Design a protein with these regions (language model features):
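Active-site neighborhood of glycoside hydrolase catalytic domains
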Residues: 1-141, 153-158, 162
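C-terminal beta-sandwich/jelly-roll accessory domains of carbohydrate-active enzymes
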Residues: 221-297
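Structural beta-strand/beta-sheet cores of well-ordered domains, especially the beta-sheet scaffolds
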Residues: 39, 72-74, 95, 147, ...
Length: 297
């Protein structure tokens, strides 16, 4: 666009349709990658274009392709939705995408749910943000922040020095769980669940062999239901028996009164039962997440 264009976030837009611009960027970026041990770069795009221009996108594809050919071991993460950089075309040249500059776990829960129509877990970056989110000012429990990030390609975007001992222990627990389960989850199908309670946002990730699953049941707001409804799962082998465990039962709050079979142990249930009847979970505060995993018995 012209030099007198309106600024966005105090920035102009590089004309990626211009081969000279692409050559300049390739030379500068490639020099850095050649001279330093860099394994990952993030391509930020945080302002709208001054006008619609498909050549801008194709030019970006061309630059990424050259960088990938010259540096095949360097991973590229494309950012962000605000710049329209998440599309199926860009996935030919990048390993991950970044949904938004907001790391507010409540907003991320919804974003990731909607993006799951198109993007698998392995390519969707999601980070544990600071105690107070820089884009919303909200303060969320470390468990909620960590489990929302663990739904996707997990990372951290925070100062760990702010963590209490209890928060540090919880973050370590969730991170270890993510590492222990990432291999099979990278190949899993994400299926959105449809809980009867509109306050709940939930999904299930099922291994291709249907022998493992994990369900994330998030409380997006205060529920109007005095008694939580069963959450029906999907995508399972109806004839298989699954050992079902509430991974984070230690996060049970005062919102849950009475006892629940998942509070202390593992249930063995058929896939048919889990899909037809569902699972009864303890009640929860808003901005909390239950994590339910199952393995074929």
């Amino acid at each position: 666009g012209p030099l007198d264009q309106l600024l966005g976030r105090n920035q102009l837009v590089l004309d990626m349709a211009n081969a000279d611009v692409r050559d300049y960027l390739f030379g500068k970026i490639s020099t850095v990658l050649s001279n330093h041990d860099v394994s990952y770069i993030k391509w930020d795009h945080n302002r709208v274009l001054p006008h619609v221009d498909a050549a801008q996108t194709y030019g970006t594809y061309s630059l990424f392709e050259r960088l990938r050919d010259a540096h095949p071991n360097v991973e590229i993460e494309s950012c962000s939705s605000g710049g329209g950089r998440i599309d199926f075309g860009i996935m030919n040249y990048t390993q991950r995408v970044w949904l938004s500059d907001s790391n507010d776990a409540a907003e991320r829960l919804r974003m990731q749910h909607e993006a799951s129509h198109f993007l698998p877990m392995a390519v969707t970056g999601s980070h544990v943000g600071p105690r107070e989110c820089h884009t919303s000012g909200r303060i969320h429990d470390i468990g909620f922040r960590a489990w929302v990030a663990a739904q996707r390609h997990m990372g951290f975007e925070m100062d760990p020095r702010e963590l209490t001992d209890a928060e540090r222990a919880k973050l370590k627990q969730v991170t270890q769980w993510w590492k222990d389960n990432r291999d099979w989850r990278h190949k899993a199908d994400i299926k959105r669940l449809a809980p009867a309670d509109p306050a709940i946002i939930a999904e299930i990730q099922v291994a291709p062999e249907q022998d493992r699953f994990v369900a994330f049941i998030g409380s997006a707001e205060t529920s109007a239901w005095s008694c939580p409804a069963s959450v029906k799962l999907t995508g399972l082998n109806p004839n298989a028996m699954y050992d079902v465990t509430l991974v984070n039962r230690d996060e049970k709050t005062a919102a849950s009164r009475g006892t629940n079979a998942l509070d202390t142990g593992t249930l063995r249930l058929s896939g048919g039962f889990l899909m037809a009847h569902g699972v009864d979970l303890p009640n929860h505060f808003p901005d909390r997440m239950w994590v339910l995993e199952g393995a074929a018995a």
